[in-house]
Amino acid sequence: MKTTLKLTAIAAMSAFILTGCATQDKSAEANAQLQQQAVLGLNWIQQSGEYQALSYQAYNAAKVAFDHAKVKKGKKKAVVVDLDETMLDNSPYAGWQVQNNKPFDGKDWTRWVEARQSGVVPGAVEFNNYVNTHGGKMFYVSNRKDSNEKAGTIDDMKRLGFNGVEDSAFYLKKDKSPKAARFEEIEKQGYEIVVYVGDNLDDFGDAIYG
């Protein structure tokens, strides 16, 4: 009886191990398929003239909106922008994910930020520097982590030619992802936000995202 129980236990354990291996294989295959779906999008971002033209068009429209914006007496003009895929181009990181069949991982992302190898979205530097030299102030409201991703972000943006990227201009993620509270912090400093630029509805506050 004891021998039978041992054999049954061993058989059950073997089945569990085999099932675990099969699950891991399926998971790896699913990740590979998911990452391959990003290839066309990456090619478009990195190689198409249309992407560049649309990006410049968006920033030209933002510049016009900034120039025509009026603020209440005593208020200062502010522009709020997201960073990733709005100001900074992280398509090389996405390409690495495809090549290695890797899903998003927070630790890998932090290593990418620390590597200081981001590119720039077409038109972003010109718009940023125009606002900061024409009576406005740029604020960078991003869900990059405030604790360990700010230094790499600032260094990268300085390298890419952005002006006005001092520490106080950054409102990165400390605990919560929604950005409305950070927008309010900016407004409490006497600013009126006249333009928002982003690639996600959360970049425009609760009125739109909620």
Language-model-detected regions and their locations in the chain:
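Structural recognition of the beta-strand scaffold that forms the well-ordered cores
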Residues: 78-81, 88-89, 137-142, 169-172, ...
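Sec-exported extracytoplasmic/periplasmic mature domains
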Residues: 67, 71, 92-93, 129-137, ...
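Stable alpha-helical elements in mature extracytoplasmic
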Residues: 54-62, 120-123, 127, 149, ...
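C-terminal cap/substrate-recognition subdomain and adjoining C-terminal extension
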Residues: 23-35, 49, 145-210
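Active-site neighborhood of HAD-like aspartate-dependent phosphohydrolases
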Residues: 72-78, 87-118
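Substrate-recognition element of Asp-dependent hydrolases with the DxDx(T/V) motif
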Residues: 85, 124-157, 199
